[in-house]
Amino acid sequence: MSSYSELSNLPIREIPGDYGFPIISAIKDRYDYFYNQGEDAWFHNKAEKYKSTVVKINMAPGPFTSNDYKLVAFLDANSFVCMFDNSLIDKTDTLGGTFKPGKEYYGGYRPVAFIDTKDPNHAALKGYILSSFAKRHNLFIPLFRNTLSDHLFNNLEKQVTEQGKADFNALLPTMTFDFIFRLLCDQKNPSDTVLGAQGPEHLRKWLFPQLIPSLSAKKLPNIIEDMLFHNFLIPFGFIKSDYNKLVDAFSKSAVSMLDEAEKLGIKREEAVQNILFLVGINMFAGLNAFFPHLFRFVGEAGASLHTQLAKEIRSVIKEEGGAITLSAINKMSLVKSVVYETLRLRPPVPLQYGKAKKEFMVQSHDASYKINKGQFVVGYQPMASRDPKIFANPDEFVPDRFMNDGEKMLKHVLWSNGRETESPAPDNKQCPGKDLVHLLGRLILVEFFIRYDTFTLEITPLFRAPNVAFNTLTKASK
């Protein structure tokens, strides 16, 4: 990546924005962010107010969860990509934003996602995770297909038939947890562990205190939710028993992965914490946010797109002799484009945080701005990946956007903490599950349109991922 200091053809501007009155303005911004405007509108309004896509902001949750909430936001494609430059941005303890969960959530360790690339442990831990995925790549397709059949499609059909509606979001946690657990735990059934049938629930309880300060659950009156979840961090003691059961289950079940860690010089205890984080944050939370958006966009596009997807999927599988293989899936260009477009519009993790390692110049499309050493910065991905100076009709779901010549635009798909054209490696912060997430997105569409011709949905907006309910499922015509 080019050094920003080399790009001097743009006028230099002071970073616009106003942090306002101490504490009071930050709390007002928090209410606007979570309740009065919503995340998307809040960031757009800041850019519009200050006529700039590089602005000063009070980042939620703010007081009193964090004392360090005066940030500079990058809201366009040009400025956002500086977040990927390891020479400029320090990612130490910034994954969750302006607050960080205590080390007790990870057994006294810091998982690799919380450490910067300069940390000596980063390359070893990231390399371990990447090699673990590589060794299990032959399981991805057959294991996920079985999980979809056992935990998703049968239940979808049953609920639509018996109740006239099927809650897609409610079915996802069991399906995703079962797949991830079996993948990383030598194909063991999570129900045979101390978790029993409550694995997803234990995982959600462990995740809740780590994620809720930056979210809105929309299940309580605003003032009560804000008082309970955005002013103070929830004590670890409330979920300690859930955490202990998760650690016990993965310690006893992920035997091969833990053996691999020891061979690399990584302590089993530290490896367990990284596995738990990988399962909980990278995969479980990420997939349960991604899949509802995927079906929302495909569902809202209507029967015409459904027909095109079904035709492509079924014809390719027929050409492959009925086999669903990686080679076959890679030939489905429309399916691939639909998944990329979903990740462009609604990245599972919309915010990237870090602190400036040194003073540098960052560029928007029309100006340069000085970022001081130590400045806390944030990039809002849904604005960067919907940049109207990069994409035509940037806010629209265009299913074939990345087909044919459109593939050259993949470098502007940024959901994985890196460009889509780049790959996760031990020396970068790109999501280690990047390729797996994309494969699973394609595979769930393949399995769906093998079974069904079309469907209709009911969408209920939530803070980030929508709630998706299937109203009808039309089985595949012969």
From Swiss-Prot:
Species of provenance: Solanum lycopersicum
Highest taxon in the source lineage: Eukaryota
Binding site residues for heme: C431
Family: Belongs to the cytochrome P450 family. 9-divinyl ether synthase subfamily.
One Pfam family from the record: p450
Catalytic activity: (9S)-hydroperoxy-(10E,12Z)-octadecadienoate = colneleate + H2O; (9S)-hydroperoxy-(10E,12Z,15Z)-octadecatrienoate = colnelenate + H2O
Residue intervals passing through the bilayer: none
InterPro entries linked: Cyt_P450, Cyt_P450_E_grp-IV, Cyt_P450_sf
PANTHER family the UniProt entry points to: 9-DIVINYL ETHER SYNTHASE, CYTOCHROME P450 26
Cited CDD domains: CYP74
An example molecular function term from Gene Ontology annotations: heme binding
Keywords of the record: Heme, Iron, Lyase, Metal-binding
Heme keyword on record: yes
Name of the protein this chain belongs to: Divinyl ether synthase CYP74D1
EC number: 4.2.1.121
Tissue: Expressed in roots. Detected in stems, but not in flower buds, petioles, cotyledons or leaves.
General function of this protein: Involved in the biosynthesis of the anti-fungal toxins colneleate and colnelenate. Can use (9S)-hydroperoxy-(10E,12Z)-octadecadienoate (9-HPOD) and (9S)-hydroperoxy-(10E,12Z,15Z)-octadecatrienoate (9-HPOT) as substrates, but has a very low activity with the corresponding 13-hydroperoxides (13-HPOD and 13-POT).
